[in-house]
Amino acid sequence: LEWLEALESGAYEQGKDCLNKDNKFCCLGVACDILSKKGTVLKTVKENGIVDYDNLSTILSEEVIDLLKLNGSTGGFWNIRDEFPHLSLASANDGGKTFLEIAAFIRKNPDVVFSDAREVQ
């Protein structure tokens, strides 16, 4: 997935609490940035440095959820794995997991992260 490759690339600086603030990204904000560059998602930069994607700055829009095949606006998990004690991708990001750790978890557990892992390749 292009999104996971971007998380692993080191091209994005990691941030917390917003999808993108001052060019520091949540793991979900990286996906939004990729989609905005493709013209799929509307990107709006506000004066305070916070970036909205489809008019949202802290959670994913329904369109992005559907495009990424995620379980909800924060990338929630339906099942929790002991080695990754978070309830969502957003909480993992804000709780200190690195982009590399998040990408590795997604690759190892697509059935937990995606609503239909068979459709995500």
Identify the function of each model-found stretch.
Residues 1-25, 32-121:
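Domain-length accessory/inserted modules outside core catalytic folds
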